[in-house]
Regions:
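Glycan-recognition and catalytic cores of secretory/periplasmic carbohydrate-active enzymes
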Residues: 1-247
Length: 247
């Protein structure tokens, strides 16, 4: 599924891409799965699975981390480039991209029960978890390879997406399910602190502070973002649902 239109005068059109596909697209597959449930038409489900499978093959590095952008040839579908748009460099670890991968493949497992998808979500999470420069509060830098780490801006949106995915992951019959929940709990404790949660009526009435949209584009740097709040609230809902079940 192509992510961006490369025609016209947009910045995307100036990158020389033919068919750019971003890891963010994994977040859109849930809509296709739902479309099949609502319509009874398996076409949507099949497209989602095809996209997930191709992304699994082309977008990940051996260590479990992912590229942001894969540019495919319009002619034959081969990979032309593996790059970034919002990360520090093509080979760097853009944190929100890793978050999208963890969340997206957890959803794909939920909808298909294909263990390969869950294994990828876990592998990408373990990669992030084991990075030596992951901050103690578990809120990632916007890019884990940014040259100004540890002074680099944090990205609360990445943290909230990862936490929400981990809560879902913790509900599956996995040997490390408890550790996924514990990691998510620690993220949520950090996000709920005054370091990241704004005072009532401040921060443009957003909940979370300190997210990053795209530093390479000098866009949305150290600001509140609506999707940071969305996945934070979703994570809170999942956390409370799990706690109610445990009573």
């Amino acid at each position: 599924i192509q992510s961006w239109d490369v025609k016209g005068n947009s910045w995307q059109s100036k990158r020389g891409w033919e068919c750019p596909v971003i890891i963010d697209n994994m977040m859109n597959l849930e809509l296709l799965f739902e479309a099949t449930k609502l319509s009874g038409d398996s076409t949507f489900y099949n497209v989602a699975v095809m996209h997930a499978d191709r992304t699994l093959k082309e977008q990940f590095r051996p260590d479990g981390s992912c590229y942001h952008v894969i540019d495919y040839s319009i002619e034959d579908g081969t990979v032309r480039h593996r790059q970034t748009a919002q990360g520090y460099s093509d080979e760097s670890v853009w944190s929100r991209g890793q978050a999208w991968a963890i969340y997206g493949y957890t959803v794909c497992y939920r909808e298909t029960k294909n263990r390969t998808y869950l294994d990828q979500a876990i592998k990408t999470f373990e990669f992030m978890k084991n990075l030596k420069n992951m901050p103690e509060d578990l809120v990632p830098y916007w890019d884990m390879d940014a040259p100004d780490v540890p002074a680099a801006p944090r990205d609360a949106s990445s943290a909230s997406v990862i936490a929400s995915a981990l809560y879902e992951m913790s509900t599956y019959d996995l040997p490390d399910a408890a550790s996924y929940r514990a990691y998510a709990d620690k993220i949520m404790e950090s996000l709920a602190s005054e370091s990241y949660t704004a005072k009532l009526g401040e921060n443009g009435r957003f909940i979370l502070m300190h997210s990053v949209g795209s530093i390479p584009h000098n866009s949305e740097v150290d600001v509140p973002l609506n999707y940071a709040d969305y996945y934070y609230l979703e994570a809170l809902k999942r956390k409370t649902d799990i706690e109610k079940t445990a009573i």
